[in-house]
């Protein structure tokens, strides 16, 4: 509703540019199912499509625009009004505490075989927790964030390829802009699949990074604080390490959280994210230069 009113205030029809949720007979935007579940319904947006993955730099730039515009339109939303659907979701300090506990408890008896992986992730802990600690010190503001900034959470016009709106709003919570930016980069600019076994294929695609950064910063760059601008590249590194350490934690715990297709699936995922994070660190200066280019 907030975004819809923002769009309408510009004189543009909001019909295809924001999700419209239907109300139930009691006026609420959800319905309780017979088994106690919650359901809601949004209007179908005609002539729209999504992309699970893409190499099209134009689409990637549009994806960046979509999430940047999402940030822009909600920049003055009272963030404290948001309900926290997943507590401590990007609390990287707690993610590493959970990792340490998984190593110590060794529930699945796998710790010895992945000592090298454990050591490499522990070496990245300070990097991964820097932005969270900055936020706790008041150096980075909490804003409205999407928290699942994948390309497939944007609707695009089938004909023009331009973005229409951001979807899948279940995880909208207070968070850091750099984490939304970073998680998108982790997903869209990886040269390989998330569970690629051959880590020699894993790297940060700087062309894709630039395409997304151009779109994102072009929309919301002027609204960012200096610290937010300076940590966009670090956000990509942080989200990649966090994702990887979660995969390795789950592997050590016996694959109890993430759905897996084979015994070492979480380990392959963790190693892939580790390789990507290490390549990002090597290319951090290049990432920062690209960010600065569009600010």
PLM region descriptions:
Residues 26-32, 130-132, 248:
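A short, acidic/glycine-rich surface segment
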């Amino acid at each position: 509703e907030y975004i819809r009113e923002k769009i309408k205030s510009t004189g543009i029809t909001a019909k295809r540019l924001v999700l419209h949720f239907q109300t139930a007979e009691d006026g609420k935007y959800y319905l309780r199912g017979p088994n106690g579940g919650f359901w809601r319904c949004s209007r179908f947006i005609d002539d729209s499509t999504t992309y699970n993955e893409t190499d099209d730099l134009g689409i990637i730039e549009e994806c960046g625009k979509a999430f940047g515009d999402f940030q822009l339109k909600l920049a003055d939303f009272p963030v404290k009004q948001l309900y926290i659907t997943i507590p401590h979701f990007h609390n990287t300090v707690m993610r590493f505490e959970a990792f340490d506990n998984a190593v110590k408890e060794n529930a699945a008896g796998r710790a010895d075989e992945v000592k090298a992986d454990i050591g490499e992730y522990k070496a990245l802990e300070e990097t991964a927790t820097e932005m969270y600690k900055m936020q706790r010190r008041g150096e980075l503001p909490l804003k409205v964030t999407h928290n699942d900034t994948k390309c497939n959470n944007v609707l695009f016009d089938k004909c023009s390829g331009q973005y229409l709106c951001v979807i899948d709003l279940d995880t909208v919570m207070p968070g850091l802009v750099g984490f939304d930016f970073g998680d998108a980069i982790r997903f869209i600019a990886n040269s390989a699949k998330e569970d690629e076994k051959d880590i020699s294929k894993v790297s940060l695609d700087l062309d894709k990074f630039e395409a997304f950064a151009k779109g994102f910063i072009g929309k919301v760059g002027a609204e960012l604080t200096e610290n937010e601008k300076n940590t966009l590249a670090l956000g990509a590194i942080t989200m990649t390490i966090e994702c990887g350490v979660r995969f390795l934690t789950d592997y050590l715990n016996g694959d109890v959280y993430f759905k897996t297709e084979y015994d070492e699936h979480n380990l392959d995922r963790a190693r892939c994210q580790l390789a990507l994070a290490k390549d990002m660190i090597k290319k951090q200066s290049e990432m920062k230069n690209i960010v600065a280019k569009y600010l």
